[in-house]
């Protein structure tokens, strides 16, 4: 069995450097083009795909729907694939986070596994 992992296409938040977490922006036009390019690349590889799983978030579900439509596979949303919650940091870029929440930012930068954003999860 082979497991292929792919990241969702671009959103406007990605393009602006904003943390998304569990916020739910959809793909922008670049992101939709990236999803179509991914589908073409997967077709070219000839690797048979039997299942397609996605996070239930718009950006991931939309990417998977585009890929699935091209490959003739229906995407299945899995709650366990949802992005972690970045709490009050969501919608902000890293520079803003460092300025607004310096202590929690420094702790997170030093050890992402043992620290968490304010009102977020680790």
Region spans (language model):
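Solvent-exposed, charged interface segments at domain starts and junctions
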Residues: 1-3, 121
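Active-site-proximal alpha-helix that buttresses catalytic centers in soluble enzyme cores
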Residues: 3, 7-74
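Phosphate-handling substructures
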Residues: 69-122
